[in-house]
Design a protein with these regions (language model features):
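Extended amphipathic, helix-rich lipid-handling scaffolds
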Residues: 1-93, 103-185, 196-198, 203-204, ...
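Ordered, soluble secondary-structure elements with a strong preference for glycine-centered loop motifs
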Residues: 188
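Short coil-to-beta strand junction motifs in C2/discoidin
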Residues: 192-193
């Protein structure tokens, strides 16, 4: 049993490492099954009325009423971790509850190391400041997240990371979108109210859109955003050191100009 206390002053630096914990008011309960010199199973229930901190020199973020239940199981290949009923408050905004499942597979003969993350639903806009402040992202990724300002809802999220690989399939993903939007950044177009599904890897992606009130803005090419009452399309993209290639083999939209169907190919060089 962990009593409600400010744990920030008790946690050793070798545990927090690059994270700065200004306050960690938390308590809960933990059950452990310890065998063969390591944890085999664990269950934890945590409630943190207040958490304040940041990663490295990034601006700190304050989180209130963080709650979760965690289940850990060691397997023959690695481990499974389930975070259930994860929820928190950011000011007046309540985020969650969310279920996250992390599976780790260690490298072995005939088997590569792999990390798999599944999430049922993520509301992006409230989550942005938390990720920016606490996630150990490379500076370029942190800059991209700040510039893109993602919003909307992601669901049925599946991520697969294979750290030993050097090709584009090192990271693979698939997810559903509901009214997702991003701001323009380095040739990537701004998007508003995109709904559908997306899958891909580090360099290539495939998006299937079925959206109402869709907005699309190539800020390096056109002064204004294209707006459509309805839009259905397949969008394919390729991103590398040369820039972004975006194409649509089929596109059907209804806007101020009426019904339009066709295809397009856009190349944006760095």
């Amino acid at each position: 049993s962990l009593p409600q206390s400010d744990w920030a002053r008790w946690l050793p630096k070798n545990l927090t490492q690059a994270w700065r914990l200004e306050k960690l008011q938390a308590g809960g309960e933990v059950w452990l099954d310890w065998r063969d010199g390591q944890v085999q199973r664990a269950v934890a229930q945590l409630h943190a009325p207040e958490l304040a901190g940041g990663y490295a020199q990034r601006k700190a973020v304050k989180v209130q009423d963080l709650a979760l239940t965690a289940f850990f199981t060691r397997t023959a290949a690695g481990f499974d971790l389930l975070l259930d009923s994860l929820a928190l408050s950011l000011g007046e905004t309540r985020w969650g509850s969310v279920q996250l499942a992390l599976q780790q597979q260690s490298a072995a003969a005939g088997r590569e190391e792999q990390w798999t993350l599944n999430a049922d639903r993520l509301d992006l806009a409230p989550l942005g400041p938390v990720v920016s402040a606490l996630a150990p992202l490379p500076e370029q990724a942190a800059e991209a997240l700040h510039a893109l300002q993602p919003q909307g809802v992601l669901s049925n999220i599946q991520l697969s990371y294979r750290p030993q690989r050097t090709d584009a399939d090192r990271l693979q993903y698939s997810l559903n979108l509901t009214q997702v939007g991003i701001s323009p950044w380095h040739g990537i177009p701004a998007v508003e109210n995109a709904s559908g599904s997306v899958s891909g890897n580090l360099t290539d992606g495939d998006g299937r859109l079925a959206s109402d009130n869709l907005g699309l803005h190539f800020d390096q090419l056109f002064p204004d955003m294209w707006r459509y009452r309805t839009a259905g399309a397949q969008l394919l993209w390729h991103y590398d050191s040369g820039g972004l290639t975006l194409r649509s083999p089929y596109l059907q939209v209804v806007g101020e100009e009426g019904e339009v169907a066709g295809d397009f190919l856009v190349r944006l060089r760095k």
